[in-house]
């Protein structure tokens, strides 16, 4: 199974920790966080790993190498300019277009059953399934409203306090059909939550939710460490 790990961000909210390293290399329990993530994915059977690179990419390559120490095969894809989340995955299209693939952020720290997530997508009729989790304060994340069939009816990226209509926050993890590449412009800055998902819903495509159970965090800000 294939997974695309997005590692191109500069981690500005984590400065000064990211002046000398990219976010995925911030240490957790004496190891770069990306090593914990790849080990978890490998244990679940995601052995074909595509990593999008931008800021301080050499450090990520040094942390993972060819992936053999973690039981995976790693392919690196570099961004020449900032492409956003969906744009960075589009840049790696040729490595991902054969089958549905998992997308995760390189700063994620999880013990979630992402294999269950992947299988749930294979069994539904959506172009993309979005991992959601219930949290107390969703203002730093995208939020979604779902119906009884787990179909996403509304999605809002980083709502202000007056715009909150749900406590189901996007984990930033998705399972996508290769068809999504038809809706992402090449070489342009384009985000999943801000651009792609609203456009797909406007065009009438079905987006489904998977409700995560377990521990999920990221190293995106100091309070998350």
PLM features: what roles do these ranges have?
Residues 5, 51, 103, 128-131, ...:
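Structural beta-sheet core signal
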Residues 33-36, 88-91, 196:
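Well-ordered alpha-helical segments embedded in enzymatic catalytic cores
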